[in-house]
């Protein structure tokens, strides 16, 4: 595997326990979980709430509710107990903000518990688990900011994602460096190849926001005009050769 931001490969990547390099499914899915619980608790009602089976509310009758992230129904009187599964798998997602996202998801689920009801986070330790257990989410957010600042990762800096042909992305990066000469030399990550071209990231201070975004906007317009301009004896080039997104909360790596 390699970093989707800078392209650095994880050399010698193996499982720390069995030393295997093969991947396997780490979650069985909500329906299978519900089926297993139904067999373990044969006389208990089991309700599945997910994207395919939306459930908004459940009554106060005894039941096991198996819900995926964000699909948790509101229980009348609150849940008598909440068990958060697959936490270790969720934290392994290919997302720079996955830890804070997990804390938000788990906190939202825990808030559905009845007063005094236990909430169990299975298989997770460390700062995220402590923040949930002590309900100190603001302190965790401050810790995350402190760790991201020296790495120049959002939201301590702003980020622009550029996708397009190699030439279009390279030209846009050159124009940004000219427009903002004080831009940090390590501000640009990439370009790296993608399925339909290349991708690069530009990390910049909030104070440089106006200049950087103006330069990128001008590059998008210039590239659009260039790709549509007919050349004598040839057909126009492909459209949408440069796409720029700024401050995207969840960049699709």
What are these model-derived regions, one by one?
Residues 1-39:
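Cys/His-rich short segments
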Residues 18, 30, 52, 120-121:
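Residue-level detector of alpha-helical recognition elements and their boundaries
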Residues 23-52, 169-175:
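Short, charged N-terminal beta->alpha structural module
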Residues 40-41, 53-99, 104, 108-253:
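Accessory helical-bundle/CTD segments and flexible terminal tails appended to RecA-like ATPase motors
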